[in-house]
Amino acid sequence: MVTDDYAERHLSFEGCFNFRDIGGYETSNGSAIRWGKYYRAGRQDRMTSKDIERAKQLRIATQIDLRRPDEIREQGRGPFEDLGARYENLAVIPDGGSERLNQLVGDVGISGARYLGYLDFGSEVWLRLFNIFADAANYPILLHCTAGKDRTGVSTAFLLSVLGAGRPIIDADYLMTNRDVERQVDYVQQNFGLPKGYDRSSMMNAAGVPQTAIVDFLDGVDERYGGPIDYLREIGVTSNTFGRIREILLTN
């Protein structure tokens, strides 16, 4: 059963948005995902001193950054390395990749087809990601991109699939992004002004996610590969790796 537990899992930082814990989700075998192990988020470079004091309490061991190198150069890495986290950059989209995606699927915004295009950039990122997930020493993990919704959403959907969460839970977790959109747009508008070409409505749309995107993505993975686990097996993630991830992240 999917319940509305957003308030319990969302961490409301002043200068960082879409930051939440995936703990507590129930899985098909009756287990639940452990709290305080895996956080998903957007960029952290605008965190305030108050935010950073709170972030220390999370004791993040590994920061997995899914952004392109040019995004990192522009935005910086945020404070977690200084707080003791090991930093890993796994660029889901390489520099120039957004333009290639636009050519492949059209510049139609967030879509399942666009998410499927992430897989066409190669398997190395996904194999490395799940090997990181399989090492208990890497936890707690913070996984993020810029907005914490697309690259982070796809990665988290894969992980939730491996852990045995059903599609309703995966959909609901993905859509929780929309719960922090208004606060994020308020922050941008008040501190920087809206980007050129955007009004408040279009900015809200850009910062949010449509349910069709994750549904179409996972349907596409099912059609192409047989499902997320089948895709991950195909690229080299082993049964032993899956087992270690479940042992780390699931309650008994």
Residue positions per predicted region:
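Ser/Thr-glycine-rich phosphate-binding loops at phosphate-binding pockets of nucleotides
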Residues: 147, 151-152
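Cys-dependent protein tyrosine phosphatase-like superfamily
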Residues: 1-142, 154-252
